[in-house]
């Protein structure tokens, strides 16, 4: 039995790293974002459960942003909502939420009196005239204060102003997340 458990665990690890399933890709992106916060300066105060867990246990906390961090030197807190997308919509907009979710995040920010940032991962296929069958992707990341993400779908003029390097660690300064 131990052998089959190990095989199952190995398959899950492989699936986590290569799956295109939206739920798994979203979890992978959340983990990536979490790892961009240095444990020397940040601590996770709250983390929502995986969506599937919340659904199975009928939990309400998945309505909150994914993380609440504390910046250790000052004790300031802020929330992060992660979303991972693989395309723009037909109007060339980046859809990051629905209207109900946007409203919940706005209420959360107001009630908790802490800023909420929307961290969006966008992975788009690269097109090459030399290798038309090649599967390559370019990854983008955006860090948008909720006050600037006023609609569930954002125009390029909005989200392009908040681009950041995909692998660059986050830092906090004067109430702003960079």
Positions of the model-derived regions?
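A short acidic/basic microdomain associated with nuclease active sites
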Residues: 34-62, 66-70
């Amino acid at each position: 039995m131990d052998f089959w458990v190990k095989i199952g665990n190995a398959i899950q690890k492989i699936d986590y790293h290569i799956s295109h399933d939206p739920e798994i890709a979203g979890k992978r992106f959340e983990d990536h974002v979490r790892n961009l916060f240095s444990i020397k300066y940040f601590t996770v105060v709250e983390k929502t459960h995986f969506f599937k867990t919340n659904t199975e246990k009928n939990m309400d906390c998945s309505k909150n942003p994914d993380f609440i961090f504390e910046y250790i030197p000052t004790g300031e807190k802020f929330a992060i909502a992660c979303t991972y997308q693989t395309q723009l919509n037909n109007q060339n907009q980046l859809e990051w939420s629905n209207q109900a979710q946007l409203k919940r995040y706005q209420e959360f920010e107001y009630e908790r009196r802490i800023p909420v940032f929307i961290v969006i991962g966008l992975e788009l296929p690269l097109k090459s005239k030399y290798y038309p069958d090649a599967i390559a992707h370019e990854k983008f990341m955006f860090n948008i204060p909720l006050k600037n993400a006023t609609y569930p779908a954002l125009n390029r003029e909005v989200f392009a102003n908040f681009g950041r390097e995909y692998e660059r660690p986050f830092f906090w300064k004067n109430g702003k997340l960079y």
